[in-house]
Design a protein with these regions (language model features):
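Short Pro/Gly-enriched beta-strand edge/turn motifs at strand-loop
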Residues: 114-122
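An amphipathic alpha-helical core segment
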Residues: 123-180
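Near-N-terminal "mature-domain entry" segment
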Residues: 2-60, 71, 77-78
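Membrane-interface helix-loop-helix modules in multi-pass inner-membrane proteins
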Residues: 88-96
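A cross-taxon signal for low-complexity, glycine/charged-rich
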Residues: 66-69
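Conserved small/polar residues in nucleotide/adenosyl-binding loops
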Residues: 183-184
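Alpha-helical transition-metal enzyme core signature, strongest for iron centers
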Residues: 25-36, 72-86, 110, 114, ...
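A charge-rich, low-complexity, intrinsically flexible signal that marks solvent-exposed coils, linkers
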Residues: 5, 10, 19, 105-109, ...
Length: 184
């Protein structure tokens, strides 16, 4: 049985309000968890990890997944996406990415500077049409890329490793920023 993750912090204000955090985590994510548990009860997917469920139900990647309800992929994908999203943050103030870390060095190798990476990541977020996610992901060789995925889709469904994500669904920012996606 899947459960709602605990947040590793109490607040992300002033970037994300406590109201948005409570609504996003406690309502949206909880609904995905409840829905997935109902959908997989008594099936071969019960007891599987989120990654296993996403891989087994990704319709765009695995033709045999057509026999699995799209709702399974949508709910499992959203839980996986949100779990990474919520656990990647740290309260303000935070020193940010250690420039000596492996990830920082890989970003510098592929984008020249952290600022160039940030600009590319932000551009992908503000140009994503509709609802979805922006991901920093790595392939099996460790090469990084930034990708836009619609709805519940994610790197795991495509055999890639998710490293960093940003939720571009309106529920993630609307209470704080309304329709100003570009300021998020």
């Amino acid at each position: 049985m899947h459960t709602l993750i605990d947040l590793p912090y109490n607040s992300l204000a002033p970037v994300i309000s406590d109201q948005t955090l409570a609504f996003h985590h406690g309502k949206h994510l909880q609904t995905y968890v409840d829905n997935l548990n109902k959908l997989i009860a008594g099936t071969d997917l019960e007891g599987k990890t989120l990654e296993e469920i996403v891989r087994a139900s990704a319709p765009s990647v695995i033709p045999s997944a057509a026999s699995v309800s799209p709702a399974v992929f949508n709910n499992a994908g959203q839980i996986l996406n949100h779990n990474l999203y919520f656990t990647q943050f740290a309260p303000v103030p935070h020193s940010g990415l250690d420039p000596e870390s492996h990830l920082a060095k890989q970003i510098a190798k592929q984008w020249s500077t952290l600022d160039a990476f940030k600009a590319d990541f932000e551009s992908k977020g503000t140009t994503l049409f509709g609802s979805g996610w922006v991901w920093l992901q790595a392939n099996e060789k460790g090469e990084l890329s930034i990708a836009q995925y619609a709805n519940a889709d994610n790197p795991v469904a495509h055999g890639l490793k998710p490293l960093l994500t940003f939720d571009v669904w309106e529920h993630a920012y609307y209470l704080d920023y309304q329709d100003r996606k570009s300021v998020v």
